[in-house]
Amino acid sequence: MLSAIQREKLTQFAQALIDQEAARVILPAEQPQSGFWFGGGNLCKSQDGGLYLCGRFRSAGDSRTGLEAGARGRELVIWRSTDRGQRFERVLSFSKADLSLPDRPVLSIEGSALHSTRNGIELFVSSEKDNIGYPEAWRSFQKEGTGVWTIERLTASTVKGLAEAPIDTVLTCRDPRWLHVKDPVVHDMSNGDLMLAFCTHPYSWTSSNSGYAIRAQGSARFQPAVYDFFPRGFTWDVAMSRITSLVNVPGCGVFADTPGLLLAFYDGGECVRQLEEHGGAVHRPRGYSCEELGGAAVLLESAPSRNERLSTNLPLFLSPYGTGCSRYVDVLQAPEGFYATWQQSQPDFSQALVMNFLSWEKANEILT
């Protein structure tokens, strides 16, 4: 799909966006210790030029303690910045009870995504819910007190109006291979359709995978989802390949004559559980659930199953601190440049949300 020079330039562009040394903390975790973070959301440009940011506060704990007592994914927050991300102020928040359906209480809030529309704003949010259950033939595999992940949507004319918006389930799956769906990612396609990418887990929780669904322009509903378009890797990302952001590859430099490409950022790891490293092995971050490492790939927008990894044998993005975790990248392409945010492991092993900005001038320089 890519020539050698295109691979080199696009990799440099991705690394300039996710610059671990240049990034600054915009939202720290609530406690300076492992298991605490803020993130799993995205940035969205408002009509007046401001930035909205959504994400969840995550506390160490076990969601199986129930709706009221469970501390884990306990709050979704929307923030606003009027100075290009220098400062953010809280606009709106949702508790687990706020996002619960009458017969499906939320056990843990997961990833979310804001999406600007012609009529206002959409908020896609995923959560673990009680009272869904595994399919009958697989029920014995469900651990006591756990739920199933689904994705919902709230719509309103303004961000503050989301507080009173009805909650509509847009994506759920009963196939045991992709039973849990979470962590929505929104991408406005060049033809006016909306691509909703998401993460899946099987009934057995042995891997993390990526799927997508298309909502045609003018339609209120998504077409049937595609669950197997981006296979897991063979090396550092053999257990997990979760897409977290889709960005149009700028049509400049070596890509001036190659339209319709998307740069995909994804989270990966060697195993869902933390592996015990052999004493003679090369010591390195390996990635596991909640401490994933970062990679990148390129997709053809019109046929996403045509894709090519930029991070084939090693991750591209590692935090210089803590466990090395660098995950949940989101990149907003704006008239003034590119805003990149991600969760970065800190020296205290919490994960802060960090930001880096790359100007169009610098992007053009890299890609030329």
Residue locations for each model-derived region?
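Beta-rich carbohydrate-recognition and catalytic domains
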Residues: 1-107, 115-183, 187-322, 334-368
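Short glycine-rich, acidic/polar surface loops and turns
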Residues: 326-329
